[in-house]
Amino acid sequence: MRVLPNNDELDFDHDSLKNNSYPKIINKYNPFRIKKNIKKYSITSIIIIILEITFIFVTFFLSLQRAIKTIMKRKDVKNYIVKKNDVKDLKVCLCTPLKLENKYIKDFVQFYQKIGVDKIFLYDNNDKDGEKIEDIIPEYIKNGFVEISDWRGKQKQLMNMMDDCYQRNYKIYDWLIFYEVDEYIHLKNYTNIKNFLINEKFDTCPKIYLNWVFHTDNDQYHYEKKPVQERFPQKETIPADKNGRHNFVKTIIRGHLPNLKIDCVHRLVRDVPGCNGNGKEVQLRLFRMPEQDFENYYIDHYFCKSVDEFIEKLNRGDAVWGHKKNFIVGTFANYFGYNKMTKKKIEYVEQKTGLDLSEFKKMLNNDKKS
């Protein structure tokens, strides 16, 4: 609050009044100054000021309303948590949208079956005349471990596919995992995911956030018919400050929570609280978790694989926006941010894509000189 000056502060030469040379302190607190200045404003300016003030109040009101709604939803959601004390009673499923993943899908399915997932729902978003998942894992489909939903030929459907999986299954399963084919959960000291999820530290947690740990291309150029864990063991070096891309999360959410809609790829439902892998409730910054864990509980993210496979990934298009990611220099700036940049690799990318990566060559030369 602004405090008016006392009499001592207003001590000045009265002759200055005759010369209209008001001291700054008087002019600052002069109540008539506002009226004089109003005359200088045009009607348009006054309208703009009124609109700005209105916008501030409306924004504040909406923020307050959202905060109240979030608090109420937090309380409401936690009332629906169903606790299970026996691993045998716990039911866990995996929801995975995919496109052009036939090379990797069998290893992915086998991995999650091995760690105790009860069922996998694959959302087939391939082109209508594209590859078919049924050709690769017929035995898992036949025995009911994998169920395929047909979303072939549809664009910009990632969020809808994820929400569809939740709405169809939240009454049946205690936990629903929303991971993609290049994401493998890592649980130190746990060989079965149910033993991890049934832990009492998650008794009041509607969601569990785990960080991505990126794996590099291991300087590989071509596809090899081996599991990605064998091909790409090298992890990206994580800086001490653990900022930026290193605190991206993906989410496991409880079932039996009604009136929810999946509205975010990373955090699933924005207004529902979540915990880290240690059971501590955390506040995300957008879809980043400041309190990371890269040692005990995280997701091995094989996002790029080899150079050829990364180019194929760009060609298949984006499941959120629907368009194909053009071969732009910025795309490979991101790629080389994770992976070792060499002259050979730059020239290979240029040859495969037609890109001009001369700026990267300059950067490489500058690094060698320094």
Give residue spans per PLM region.
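N-proximal low-complexity "stem/linker" segments adjacent to membrane-targeting elements
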Residues: 11-110
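An acidic- and aromatic-residue-enriched active-site/binding cleft used to recognize and process polar
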Residues: 97-100, 125-128, 151-154, 181-182, ...
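Short, acidic, metal-binding catalytic loop of nucleotide-sugar glycosyltransferases
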Residues: 110-119
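Short loop/turn motifs at secondary-structure junctions
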Residues: 116-117, 172, 180, 204
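Short hydrophobic alpha-helical runs that function as membrane-insertion/retention elements
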Residues: 119-124, 146-148
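Active-site-proximal specificity loops/subdomain of glycosyltransferases
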Residues: 129-178, 186-187
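Catalytic-site signature of metal-activated, phosphate-bearing donor transferases
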Residues: 158-163, 187-370
